[in-house]
């Protein structure tokens, strides 16, 4: 298998990823700004499929209408020249001080209305550029103190905002769905919808739940100490994995945004195994930050590494699944039984079945052959580490 990416792999990057200048809470920028047109050109040369953006990544905040059209025109020309696509777009409702208390859930009603209009304007551009997914990350939706926000009212306002956006895209006839991106801990101390589970539960309360899914990010779930592949499995099970952000994270700490494959390599292996075996057809979107120690050569090397690592893990996962010894271990672990309904014969038959309880020999069941999970896991490790042919 070749580890050289092609557009068929559907690898995408945000303008804000390779374009991150290295500025953080403790230090100024270490790289100059990167022209979005150059980003499109360089990513195309590396074999990427598409590029994504916040409105303010492409069009500097406060631009006039004339300036806005000029930025869009240059960007569109770069897309046309390279064949790159825009599968997803999103709105920046977190950088400008006006959003210091949030966008959709700010206590200030005027700010909430502005946030909706800002989002709607970029939805129009996203649809114009062919995007099929619109991501919503509520980075400022939350609080640092208990009395600052009535969470029930805030969730009402969040619901109101998404219902209005759903109404808008439906009225416009846009072929566009929303993907809510959960994240805990930062930049607000307590953010609303911090995990995949929170977002999935929230979606079921919306007026058009079919329009809404999730955009989980590797590091975000791991910041909460959760198993990312398990979260993705639940999103797939719910039919709500509309988009995914791939990066690396080393445990429960700040959002590191390492290149994909760095950090928790085992979780990355199981994630790729799941996405490929489940037939996920969406973009493999990298939301990472090249370390501030890197120059632009390092930026592009980091982007290339994201794609290469995914392809290596894809090859290793496929070899793992095709290995006869692995298949035997899977049968011994009785995963085929887990896929069988527990009571396909129905409740009445279950209650009438004495072997299910009254005559069930718990000692005999406990004494059955052990579950060879360690053997199965070591086989996975062998494949991951390249110790099997």
Curated annotation (Swiss-Prot):
Single GO molecular function: magnesium ion binding
Compartments (UniProt record): Cytoplasm
Domain of life according to the entry: Bacteria
Positions bound to Mg(2+) 2: 217, 220, 255, 257
Keyword Ribonucleoprotein: no
Keywords, comma-separated and alphabetical: Carbohydrate metabolism, Cytoplasm, Isomerase, Magnesium, Metal-binding, Xylose metabolism
Record text on cofactor binding: Binds 2 magnesium ions per subunit.
Transmembrane found in the keyword field: no
Active site residues per record: 54, 57
Binding site for Mg(2+) 1: 181, 217, 245, 287
CC cofactor: Mg(2+)
Enzyme nomenclature, EC number: 5.3.1.5
GO cellular component annotations of the record: cytoplasm
Enzyme superclass (EC): isomerase
Catalytic activity: alpha-D-xylose = alpha-D-xylulofuranose
Primary location class: cytoplasm
Alphabetical list of InterPro entries matching this protein: Xyl_isomerase-like_sf (IPR036237), Xyl_isomerase-like_TIM-brl (IPR013022), XylA_actinobac (IPR013453), Xylose_isomerase (IPR001998)
Cystine connections: none
GO biological process: D-xylose metabolic process
PROSITE patterns for the chain: XYLOSE_ISOMERASE
Protein's job: Involved in D-xylose catabolism.
HAMAP family per record: Xylose_isom_A
Membership in a protein family: Belongs to the xylose isomerase family.
Assembly information from the UniProt record: Homotetramer.
Protein name: Xylose isomerase
């Amino acid at each position: 298998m070749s580890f050289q990416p092609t557009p068929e792999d559907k690898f995408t990057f945000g303008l804000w990823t390779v374009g991150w200048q290295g500025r953080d809470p403790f230090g100024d920028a270490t790289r100059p700004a990167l022209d979005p047109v150059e980003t499109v050109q360089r990513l195309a040369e590396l074999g990427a499929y598409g590029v994504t953006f916040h409105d303010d990544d492409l069009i500097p905040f406060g631009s006039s209408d004339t300036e806005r059209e000029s930025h869009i025109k240059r960007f569109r020309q770069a897309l046309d020249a390279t064949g790159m696509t825009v599968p997803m777009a999103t709105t920046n409702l977190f950088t400008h001080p006006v959003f210091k208390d949030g966008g959709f859930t700010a206590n200030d009603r005027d700010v909430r209305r502005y946030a909706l209009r800002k989002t709607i304007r970029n939805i129009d551009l996203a649809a114009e550029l062919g995007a099929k997914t619109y991501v919503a990350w509520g980075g400022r939706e939350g609080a640092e103190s208990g009395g600052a926000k009535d969470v029930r009212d805030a969730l009402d306002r969040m619901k109101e905002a998404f219902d209005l956006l759903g109404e808008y895209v439906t009225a416009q006839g846009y072929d566009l769905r929303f993907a809510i991106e959960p994240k805990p801990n930062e930049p607000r101390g307590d953010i609303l919808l911090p995990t995949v589970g929170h977002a999935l539960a929230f979606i079921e309360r919306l007026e058009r739940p079919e329009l809404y899914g999730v955009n989980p990010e590797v590091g975000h779930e791991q910041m909460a100490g959760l198993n990312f592949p398990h979260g993705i499995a639940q999103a797939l099970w719910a039919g709500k994995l509309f988009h995914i952000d791939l990066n690396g994270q080393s445990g429960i700490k700040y959002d590191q945004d390492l290149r994909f494959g760095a950090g928790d390599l085992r979780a990355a292996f199981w994630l790729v195994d799941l996405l490929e075996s489940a037939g996920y057809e969406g973009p493999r979107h990298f939301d990472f930050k090249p370390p501030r120690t890197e120059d632009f050569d390092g930026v592009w090397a980091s982007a290339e590494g994201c794609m290469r690592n995914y392809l290596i893990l894809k090859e290793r996962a496929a070899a793992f699944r095709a290995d006869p010894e692995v298949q035997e271990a899977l049968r011994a672990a009785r995963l085929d039984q887990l896929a069988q309904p527990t009571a396909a014969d129905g409740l009445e038959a279950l209650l009438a079945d004495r072997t299910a309880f009254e005559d069930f020999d718990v000692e005999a069941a406990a004494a059955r052959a052990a579950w060879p999970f360690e053997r199965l896991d070591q086989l996975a490790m062998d494949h991951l580490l390249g110790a099997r042919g």
